[in-house]
From Swiss-Prot:
CDD domains: ASKHA_NBD_BK. GO terms for molecular function: acetate kinase activity; ATP binding; butyrate kinase activity. It is found in: Cytoplasm. It comes from the Bacteria. One of its GO terms (biological process) is butyrate metabolic process. It holds the Pfam family Acetate_kinase. Its EC number is 2.7.2.7. Pathway: Lipid metabolism; butanoate metabolism. NCBIfam families: butyr_kinase, PRK03011.1-5. It catalyses: butanoate + ATP = butanoyl phosphate + ADP. GO terms for cellular component: cytoplasm. This is Butyrate kinase.
C-alpha cells in the first residue's frame, strides 16, 4: 500500500516542504521567511510555532488533507553523535533539539515541527541521517594531539542517499559495497563507506580536507597558529576565514564555481590555478579514502552541485580512475533522501532507531 509523507527541511531563511506518495513527489514548496519575520525571535527554537503555522497554512491552501498522511520526516539537527539511519523522534531528542546541545541551527526545528504535527495526527515523526552522523572507526579519531579528537561533521544525508542509490542500481545492498563518496557543494566532504558505515570522512565544517567555494579545508597548522596570535584577527574572524570566507571566495572574491570555471576556461590564469587546485585536493582526498578501504573500492561517486561541472568531474576522473570507476550523481535531493529514509521504516526494510 502506498504511503504518504510530509517532509520538512528548515533552513536559516526558508523552510522547504514536500509531500510524497511513496517516492513520487506530489508537490514541494520553498517557504521564504524575511529577516524581519525571523528577527522577532531571540533564538531558533522560538521560531517553531511561526514556521509550523506557515507550513499548515500552505498545506491548507493547496487543499491537501493532512489526515491522509502516514508519517512526517524532518531534517535532523545538531544532536549528539549518532550512527546513520532513521530515528523516531522521542523526548530525549526533543530535549536536545530545544536546548541546542550541539549548537543552534535551523535544522534543529525539523524534528520539533514534525513531531508537533505528527502528534496531532497520531502518526510517527522521524529524522534521517543528520549532519552529526558519526561512524568513524576508532583509529580514525586519533589526531596526533591528545587534546583534539577528529570528529565527523559532513553531508551525511546526501552521502548516504547516493551510496544507497549506487548499491541499488548495482543490485547490491548498501551494507555489501565499499565506495568513496565525494560531496562538492558550499563545503566538500569525501567519505570512505565500508559495509554500510562511513568509517572515515573529513570534517567538512571545521577546516579539514579539501578547500571548497567558501571553506578553507585543512591549512598548514603552524602558520594558522601564528596568524591567530598575530593580533590582526579576533577568534570569530579566524573561524570565518575557515568557514564562510575561506576557499575560493578568499582567493577570487566569488563562491560561484560556475563563474570560476567560466573564467578559468576563458584563459584567466589565477582562476585556472584555483580551480585546478580544488580538483587536485579533492583527488588527493579520494586517494586517502581508497587507502582507508585498503584498495578494495567498488566505485567513486561524485555528487553535490559542483558535480554538474563537466570539466571538474572529467579532471577528477582522469586522476583517480586507476583506483575504481567514477560514477556521477550531480546535485542533491534532500527531500527525496528524507522520504526514502522514512519509507525504509514504513515498508519494514529497517527498524527506526532510538535516540538516547
Amino acid at each position: 500500500m502506498a504511503h504518504k509523507l510530509l517532509i520538512i527541511n528548515p533552513g536559516s531563511t526558508s523552510t522547504k516542504i514536500g509531500v510524497f506518495e511513496d517516492e513520487n513527489l506530489i508537490f514541494e514548496e520553498t517557504l521564504r521567511h524575511s529577516a524581519e519575520e525571523i528577527g522577532k525571535y531571540s533564538n531558533v527554537y522560538e521560531q517553531f510555532p511561526f514556521r509550523k503555522e506557515v507550513i499548515l497554512n500552505v498545506l491548507k491552501e493547496k487543499g491537501f488533507d493532512i489526515n491522509t498522511l502516514d508519517a512526517i520526516v524532518g531534517r535532523g539537527g545538531l544532536l549528539k553523535p549518532v550512527e546513520g539511519g532513521t530515528y523516531e523522534v522521542n523526548d530525549a531528542m526533543l530535549k536536545d533539539l530545544r536546548e541546542s546541545v550541539r549548537g543552534e541551527h535551523a535544522s534543529n526545528l525539523g524534528g520539533i515541527i514534525g513531531n508537533e504535527i505528527a502528534k496531532s495526527l497520531n502518526i510517527p515523526a522521524f529524522i534521517v541521517d543528520p549532519v552529526v552522523v558519526d561512524e568513524l572507526q576508532d583509529i580514525a579519531r586519533i589526531s596526533g594531539m591528545p587534546e583534539i579528537e577528529r570528529t565527523s561533521i559532513f553531508h551525511a544525508l546526501n552521502q548516504k542517499a547516493v551510496a544507497r542509490r549506487y548499491a541499488k542500481e548495482n543490485n547490491k545492498s548498501y551494507e555489501d559495497v565499499n565506495i568513496v563518496v565525494v560531496h562538492m557543494g558550499g563545503g566538500s566532504s569525501v567519505g570512505a563507506h565500508k559495509n554500510g558505515k562511513i568509517i572515515d570522512v573529513n570534517n567538512a565544517l571545521d577546516g579539514e580536507g579539501p578547500f571548497s567555494p567558501e571553506r578553507s579545508g585543512g591549512v598548514p597548522i603552524g602558520d594558522l597558529v601564528r596568524l591567530c596570535y598575530s593580533g590582526k584577527y579576533t577568534l570569530d574572524e579566524i573561524i570565518k576565514k575557515i568557514n564562510g570566507k575561506g576557499g575560493a571566495v578568499a582567493y577570487l572574491g566569488t563562491n560561484d564555481f560556475r563563474e570560476v570555471e567560466e573564467k578559468a576556461l576563458a584563459g584567466d590564469e589565477k582562476y585556472k590555478l584555483i580551480l585546478d587546485a580544488f580538483i587536485y585536493q579533492i583527488s588527493k582526498e579520494i586517494g586517502k579514502c581508497s587507502v582507508v578501504l585498503e584498495g578494495n573500492v567498488d566505485a567513486i561517486v561524485l555528487t553535490g552541485g559542483i558535480a554538474y561541472s563537466k570539466y571538474v568531474t572529467k579532471e577528477i576522473e582522469n586522476k583517480v580512475k586507476f583506483i575504481a570507476p567514477v560514477v556521477l550523481y550531480p546535485g542533491e535531493d534532500e527531500l527525496l533522501a528524507l522520504t526514502q529514509g522514512g519509507l525504509r521504516v514504513l515498508n519494514g526494510e529497517e527498524k527506526a532507531k532510538e535516540y538516547k
